[in-house]
């Protein structure tokens, strides 16, 4: 009789069979079960992302409505947003509710600027009205720079680094209180500069022409002095 052969191969486990700790469902019990799994470390990074995506889809309409209401309020009453709007208008541009869009984003960012379309605000990433104000101001600095300096967004990393330095410095997102309470940065000295530099490097790293972190840091360093000192359209760093 022929010898029987025993297979040593293990059954393949598909991605669908992997337990990430995330449980589907919109009911209150399932929601808190997922929260408990996150708090106790029973949910993987993939599961946490699944939880966030499900939450964002469930809250999309409410998130966008809240974002639009706060956007309109800031356009009317926020000193920095009104000042940036006026400065952009003086250069022949126009940013208002018709081209500042509140949308659900699938990548984890606060917003973006496109010269053709305007400003995108990621409604599902906005923590509060202050966060929205910082994000709008940041993207408005990009819009101002595009109109005044003719930024080459595609091919010139120095241009990208300079406008990121200015946007992070002038928008208010790097002021001490924001860093301390929201991002857990505890330094008291040189905090503003370190925040601006860190965010500029991360932004340049995301550009197609950037090779690595070292390349991004080199580009940021090359333009740092002139771009950090340039506070236009403000006389000095606004906040």
From Swiss-Prot:
UniProt keyword annotation of Protease present: yes
GO biological process, one term: mitochondrial proton-transporting ATP synthase complex assembly
Name of the encoding gene: atp23
Name of the molecule in the record: Mitochondrial inner membrane protease atp23
DNA repair as UniProt keyword: no
A molecular function (GO) term: metalloendopeptidase activity
Lineage: superkingdom: Eukaryota
PANTHER family, sorted: MITOCHONDRIAL INNER MEMBRANE PROTEASE, MITOCHONDRIAL INNER MEMBRANE PROTEASE ATP23 HOMOLOG
Similarity-based family: Belongs to the peptidase M76 family.
UniProt entry keywords in alphabetical sequence: Hydrolase, Membrane, Metal-binding, Metalloprotease, Mitochondrion, Mitochondrion inner membrane, Protease
Ranges annotated as biased composition (Polar residues): 1-13
Purpose of the protein: Has a dual role in the assembly of mitochondrial ATPase. Acts as a protease that removes N-terminal residues of mitochondrial ATPase CF(0) subunit 6 at the intermembrane space side. Also involved in the correct assembly of the membrane-embedded ATPase CF(0) particle, probably mediating association of subunit 6 with the subunit 9 ring.
Species: Emericella nidulans (strain FGSC A4 / ATCC 38163 / CBS 112.46 / NRRL 194 / M139) (Aspergillus nidulans)
EC number: 3.4.24.-
Primary location recorded for the protein, binned into one broad class: mitochondrion
């Amino acid at each position: 009789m022929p010898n029987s052969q025993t297979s040593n191969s293990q059954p393949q486990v598909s991605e669908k069979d992997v337990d990430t700790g995330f449980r589907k469902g919109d009911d209150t019990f399932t929601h808190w079960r997922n929260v408990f799994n996150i708090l106790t470390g029973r949910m993987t990074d993939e599961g946490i992302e699944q939880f966030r995506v499900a939450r964002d889809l469930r809250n999309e309409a409410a998130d966008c409505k809240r974002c639009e209401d706060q956007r309109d309020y800031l356009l009317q009453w926020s000193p920095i947003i009104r000042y940036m709007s006026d400065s952009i208008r003086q250069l022949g541009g126009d940013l208002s509710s018709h081209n500042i869009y509140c949308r659900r984003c699938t990548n984890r960012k606060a917003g973006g600027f496109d010269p053709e379309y305007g400003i995108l605000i990621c409604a599902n990433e906005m923590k509060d009205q202050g966060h929205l104000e910082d994000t709008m101001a940041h993207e408005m600095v990009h819009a101002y720079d595009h109109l005044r300096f003719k930024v080459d967004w595609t091919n010139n990393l120095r241009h990208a680094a300079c406008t990121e330095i200015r946007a992070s410095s002038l928008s208010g997102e790097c002021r001490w209180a924001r860093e301390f309470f929201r991002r857990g940065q505890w330094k008291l000295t040189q905090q503003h500069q370190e925040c601006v530099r860190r965010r500029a490097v991360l932004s340049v790293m995301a550009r197609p022409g950037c090779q690595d972190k070292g390349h991004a840091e080199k580009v940021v360093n090359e333009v740092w002095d002139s771009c950090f000192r340039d506070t236009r359209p403000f006389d000095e760093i606004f906040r």
